């Protein structure tokens, strides 16, 4: 490709820091702007904080009319569910990210489940409720463990795997009565518990063709040994050996093919990234735990470390309907990301922690900012997940060793990280 592209990246997390890192390497990039960004981005890339309201159509379109871009890459789910890609499409600006109809695959768990039922995609049995009393009655007839999910967006924290009836009842009360997730909890999906190993697979689609990125395995629980509450993700590694070639073939034929076909049939070809969170049963059968309409966080940080090619070209081709015949080249070896989080995360956590960050020692270790901000030239924490440390090496063990040896050099009080990322594959 001979084009030069001015790119706008939307988001502020570790995922966006990683995407930006690889976009900057592209020969196609003429200029990168980021909104709202975090404490790790160079000042010259950041748009002013009052540039536009990311969930407001008039504000977004007014800004884009005055500040044209050749491509917009949307990191988080909220703007996509709100309709960001639709608003940009009205101005003929390519967006890497699906329209609001397709984005409901993440915006509503009930919508996602109904699509899976229609397309005969393997997933857990479920029932959706909008009344607290009905959900409690249904619960009485079910065995434990059971999974309780707020229907709408909840930053990865709206799911409870209940190991007792009391725990399930508490989860339902928190969603319906205490409004823990606001309007995202107006409906609740109750589904059967699935046994097996989880894995994440990303598909990049231009609405007609798609290709898969290497599989990753996330670590959602806060503490070592998969203990503690669910989080947005405490670390990941790639590739995930649980996804064999034969399982990958099933994932294509039983999950991605029918899902993309159904979106086309409904008049909404899926453009962007579709993330399948999978459960692989002990006998090697994949089932869908959830779909997301964007790059996963933190999996993106290690998946992109394994890509051997021009990320910007891939995203631009997907956004303009030109990926037929393209495959993502993948490096040999393995990559890992370990998240440094604030004490108390994912509940009430410390903020404004001063961060003393060492230089990344070699080309195989990268430090990606997530919940950080800059004040007077110094970096402080601003979110629950503060940093992601990524290492890529000849094998998973060497990558894990590199990541943890770098983490030990970071001076940040009142923080923690899991010390067993990648344990299932080591």
UniProtKB/Swiss-Prot annotation:
What reaction is this protein's catalytic activity?
5-phospho-beta-D-ribosylamine + glycine + ATP = N(1)-(5-phospho-beta-D-ribosyl)glycinamide + ADP + phosphate + H(+)
Residues that, per the record, bind Mg(2+) = 290, 292
Q: Which Pfam families match?
A: GARS_A, GARS_C, GARS_N
In this protein, which residues make up the domain named ATP-grasp? 113-320
Top-level taxon in the UniProt lineage: Bacteria
EC number(s)? 6.3.4.13
Whether Hydrolase counts among this entry's keywords is no
Residues the entry annotates as binding ATP: 139-200
Which cofactors does this protein require? Mg(2+); Mn(2+)
What does the Swiss-Prot or TrEMBL cofactor note state?
Binds 1 Mg(2+) or Mn(2+) ion per subunit.
Q: Which GO terms describe its molecular function?
A: ATP binding; metal ion binding; phosphoribosylamine-glycine ligase activity
* PROSITE patterns (UniProt xref): ATP_GRASP (PS50975), GARS (PS00184)
- Pathway, per UniProt? Purine metabolism; IMP biosynthesis via de novo pathway; N(1)-(5-phospho-D-ribosyl)glycinamide from 5-phospho-alpha-D-ribose 1-diphosphate: step 2/2
Show the InterPro entries listed in the entry: ATP-grasp, ATP_grasp_subdomain_1, PreATP-grasp_dom_sf, PRibGlycinamid_synth_ATP-grasp, PRibGlycinamide_synth, PRibGlycinamide_synth_C-dom, PRibGlycinamide_synth_C_sf, PRibGlycinamide_synth_CS
Question: Which keywords, in A-to-Z order, does the entry hold?
Answer: ATP-binding, Ligase, Magnesium, Manganese, Metal-binding, Nucleotide-binding, Purine biosynthesis
Gene Ontology BP annotations: 'de novo' IMP biosynthetic process; purine nucleobase biosynthetic process
Q: Which family does it belong to?
A: Belongs to the GARS family.
Q: Which PANTHER family match?
A: PHOSPHORIBOSYLAMINE--GLYCINE LIGASE, PHOSPHORIBOSYLAMINE--GLYCINE LIGASE, CHLOROPLASTIC
The protein's name: Phosphoribosylamine--glycine ligase
Task: List the gene name.
Answer: purD
